[in-house]
C-alpha cells in the first residue's frame, strides 16, 4: 500500500511512475476521496470544538433553565457530528479500498518498458549442454521412465495436475530437502513450516487481495484461501508487530505446496509440469532495514542462484521492466533456467524487493531503539526454488541418449547414492 500522505504530496510524480507499469490507476478518485475525508474531518473537529466550548459554558450556569436553548442546540450539533462521523467512516473505507488496489511504485533503477521483451538480461551462468541426439522435453522423459503420470493426475484432479511416481516422487522430495538444507545450513535462514491455508487479512497483507481474488482458490463455507506461495503466510508471521532493529534482517525459508488457478493461462504450457494448479516451492523471505534492502536483495538473489550452480544447471538472470514486475514489487529479478528439450530459458525464481509496500499493508514495523518512532520494514522474497521446474531442468539437462537421466552430484546423497534413473 502506498502512503496516502506521500501520494497526496507527489501525485503527479506517482502518476507518471505508475504509467510506466501500464497500470490504469484513477488517481482523480484519490483526489476526490482524500479531499472529502479532509473536509469531513475539518467539519467534525470544528463542531466538536464548538460542543466542548458550549458544554463548558453550560456547566458554569447554575440555573440550567437559562441554558435550555443552548442545550437543545448542542443536541442538534451532536446529531450532526454523528452523521458526519458515519459519512467519514464510509469515505475512509472507500479510500482504504482504493489504496489497496494501487500497485507499488517501481524503484528508480527498474528498467522502463512496455512488455517482457523490454526485460534486461544482467548475467548468465553455465554452459548449455551439447547433445549428439535430439533432446526430449521433460514430459516425454518422465513418461518413458514411468516417473511422471499426467494421465492419472488428470483422472484424480483434472487438467494441470500430475502424479509423481517412484523415482519421480523421490527426486521431488530430494530437491526439497536439498534446498532447505542449503538455505538453513549455508545461508543461515530459519526454517518455517506455515499453514497451507490463510485468512483474508494475510492475503491482503501481501497484496493478493482485494485485486486478484479470482486467481485464488477460496474455501467454500469458511473465509480461507489456499496459499499461492509461501510468501503469504511467512510474510504475515510478523503482521501487526513491531520488531527490533537489532534483530534485522530476519531471514526465513519455507517449503510449501502452492495452489493457483492460472486463470489467464488458458492454452499455455498445457503439457508437462511448467504450469500446474498445485506445485511445490521452497521460498525465501526477508524482513530488512530500509537502508540495506537492496543489498539484501542481491544476497537473496545469489542464495537462489546457488541452488542452480550446485546442481550444474545453466541459467540467466533478468531484470524485469516496469510493465512486467508484479503488483507489490518495486524491483524484481527473474532467474531463468535453460531447458534444452524446449530450447528456451524458463523462469524458475522471482526475487523481489517490495520496499515498505507489504509492510504498510500488514503493519510490520521496527524501532531503532526503545524511544524511537516505529518505521516500516522492507520485505523481500524469492523462490529458492520452484521444485517442479527444477526437476524439469534436471530431466532435460541431464538426459542421456539411452533415455536415462543422470543425477547431479550434489543431489546424490539425497537420492540414496543413486547416480542415474533408468
UniProtKB/Swiss-Prot annotation:
<feature type="binding site">
    <location>
        <position position="383"/>
    </location>
    <ligand>
        <name>L-serine</name>
    </ligand>
</feature>
<dbReference type="InterPro" id="IPR002317">
    <property type="entry name" value="Ser-tRNA-ligase_type_1"/>
</dbReference>
<dbReference type="InterPro" id="IPR042103">
    <property type="entry name" value="SerRS_1_N_sf"/>
</dbReference>
<dbReference type="InterPro" id="IPR002314">
    <property type="entry name" value="aa-tRNA-synt_IIb"/>
</dbReference>
<dbReference type="InterPro" id="IPR033729">
    <property type="entry name" value="SerRS_core"/>
</dbReference>
<feature type="binding site">
    <location>
        <begin position="229"/>
        <end position="231"/>
    </location>
    <ligand>
        <name>L-serine</name>
    </ligand>
</feature>
<feature type="binding site">
    <location>
        <begin position="347"/>
        <end position="350"/>
    </location>
    <ligand>
        <name>ATP</name>
    </ligand>
</feature>
<feature type="binding site">
    <location>
        <begin position="260"/>
        <end position="262"/>
    </location>
    <ligand>
        <name>ATP</name>
    </ligand>
</feature>
<dbReference type="InterPro" id="IPR006195">
    <property type="entry name" value="aa-tRNA-synth_II"/>
</dbReference>
<keyword id="KW-0436">Ligase</keyword>
<dbReference type="Pfam" id="PF00587">
    <property type="entry name" value="tRNA-synt_2b"/>
</dbReference>
<feature type="binding site">
    <location>
        <position position="283"/>
    </location>
    <ligand>
        <name>L-serine</name>
    </ligand>
</feature>
<keyword id="KW-0648">Protein biosynthesis</keyword>
<dbReference type="GO" id="GO:0006434">
    <property type="term" value="P:seryl-tRNA aminoacylation"/>
</dbReference>
<dbReference type="GO" id="GO:0005737">
    <property type="term" value="C:cytoplasm"/>
</dbReference>
<comment type="function">
    <text>Catalyzes the attachment of serine to tRNA(Ser). Is also able to aminoacylate tRNA(Sec) with serine, to form the misacylated tRNA L-seryl-tRNA(Sec), which will be further converted into selenocysteinyl-tRNA(Sec).</text>
</comment>
<dbReference type="InterPro" id="IPR010978">
    <property type="entry name" value="tRNA-bd_arm"/>
</dbReference>
<dbReference type="GO" id="GO:0004828">
    <property type="term" value="F:serine-tRNA ligase activity"/>
</dbReference>
<comment type="similarity">
    <text>Belongs to the class-II aminoacyl-tRNA synthetase family. Type-1 seryl-tRNA synthetase subfamily.</text>
</comment>
<dbReference type="InterPro" id="IPR015866">
    <property type="entry name" value="Ser-tRNA-synth_1_N"/>
</dbReference>
<protein>
    <recommendedName>
        <fullName>Serine--tRNA ligase</fullName>
        <ecNumber>6.1.1.11</ecNumber>
    </recommendedName>
</protein>
<comment type="pathway">
    <text>Aminoacyl-tRNA biosynthesis; selenocysteinyl-tRNA(Sec) biosynthesis; L-seryl-tRNA(Sec) from L-serine and tRNA(Sec): step 1/1.</text>
</comment>
<dbReference type="GO" id="GO:0016260">
    <property type="term" value="P:selenocysteine biosynthetic process"/>
</dbReference>
<keyword id="KW-0547">Nucleotide-binding</keyword>
<dbReference type="InterPro" id="IPR045864">
    <property type="entry name" value="aa-tRNA-synth_II/BPL/LPL"/>
</dbReference>
<comment type="subunit">
    <text>Homodimer. The tRNA molecule binds across the dimer.</text>
</comment>
<keyword id="KW-0030">Aminoacyl-tRNA synthetase</keyword>
<dbReference type="Pfam" id="PF02403">
    <property type="entry name" value="Seryl_tRNA_N"/>
</dbReference>
<keyword id="KW-0067">ATP-binding</keyword>
<dbReference type="GO" id="GO:0005524">
    <property type="term" value="F:ATP binding"/>
</dbReference>
<keyword id="KW-0963">Cytoplasm</keyword>
Amino acid at each position: 500500500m502506498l502512503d496516502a500522505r506521500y501520494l497526496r504530496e507527489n501525485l503527479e510524480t506517482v502518476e507518471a511512475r505508475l504509467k510506466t507499469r501500464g497500470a490504469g490507476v484513477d488517481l482523480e478518485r484519490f483526489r476526490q476521496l482524500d479531499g472529502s475525508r479532509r473536509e469531513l474531518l475539518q467539519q467534525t473537529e470544528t463542531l466538536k470544538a464548538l460542543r466542548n466550548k458550549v458544554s463548558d459554558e453550560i456547566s458554569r450556569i447554575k440555573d440550567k433553565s437559562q441554558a435550555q436553548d443552548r442545550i437543545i442546540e448542542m443536541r442538534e450539533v451532536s446529531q450532526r457530528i454523528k452523521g458526519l462521523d458515519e459519512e467519514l467512516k464510509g469515505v475512509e473505507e472507500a479510500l482504504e479500498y482504493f489504496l489497496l488496489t494501487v500497485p507499488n511504485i517501481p524503484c528508480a533503477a527498474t528498467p522502463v518498458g512496455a512488455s517482457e521483451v523490454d526485460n534486461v538480461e544482467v548475467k548468465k551462468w553455465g554452459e548449455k549442454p551439447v547433445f549428439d541426439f535430439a533432446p526430449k522435453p521433460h514430459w516425454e522423459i518422465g513418461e518413458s521412465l514411468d516417473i511422471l503420470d499426467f494421465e492419472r493426475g488428470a483422472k484424480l484432479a483434472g487438467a494441470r495436475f500430475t502424479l509423481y511416481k517412484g523415482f519421480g516422487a523421490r527426486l521431488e522430495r530430494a530437491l526439497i530437502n536439498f534446498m532447505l538444507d542449503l538455505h538453513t545450513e549455508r545461508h543461515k535462514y530459519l526454517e518455517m513450516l506455515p499453514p497451507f491455508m490463510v485468512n483474508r487479512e494475510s492475503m491482503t497483507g501481501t497484496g493478493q487481495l482485494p485485486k486478484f481474488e479470482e486467481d485464488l482458490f477460496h474455501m467454500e463455507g469458511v473465509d480461507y484461501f489456499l496459499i499461492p506461495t509461501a510468501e503469504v503466510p511467512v510474510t504475515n508471521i510478523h503482521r501487526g508487530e513491531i520488531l527490533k532493529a537489532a534483530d534485522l534482517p530476519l531471514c526465513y525459508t519455507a517449503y510449501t505446496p502452492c495452489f493457483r488457478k492460472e486463470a489467464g493461462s488458458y492454452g499455455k504450457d498445457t503439457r508437462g509440469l511448467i504450469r500446474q494448479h498445485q506445485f511445490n516451492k521452497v521460498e525465501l523471505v526477508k524482513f530488512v532495514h530500509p537502508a540495506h534492502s537492496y543489498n539484501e536483495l542481491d544476497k537473496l538473489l545469489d542464495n537462489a542462484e546457488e541452488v542452480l550452480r550446485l546442481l550444474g544447471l545453466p541459467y540467466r538472470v533478468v531484470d524485469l521492466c516496469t510493465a512486467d514486475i508484479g503488483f507489490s514489487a518495486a524491483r524484481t529479478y527473474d532467474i531463468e533456467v535453460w531447458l534444452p528439450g524446449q530450447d528456451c530459458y524458463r523462469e524458475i525464481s522471482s526475487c523481489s524487493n517490495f520496499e515498505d509496500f507489504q509492510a504498510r499493508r500488514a503493519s510490520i514495523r521496527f524501532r531503532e531503539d526503545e524511544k524511537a518512532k516505529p518505521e516500516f520494514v522492507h520485505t523481500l522474497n524469492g523462490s529458492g526454488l520452484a521444485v517442479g521446474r527444477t526437476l524439469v531442468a534436471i530431466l532435460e539437462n541431464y538426459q542421456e541418449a539411452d533415455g536415462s537421466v543422470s543425477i547431479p552430484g550434489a543431489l546424490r546423497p539425497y537420492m540414496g547414492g543413486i547416480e542415474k534413473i533408468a
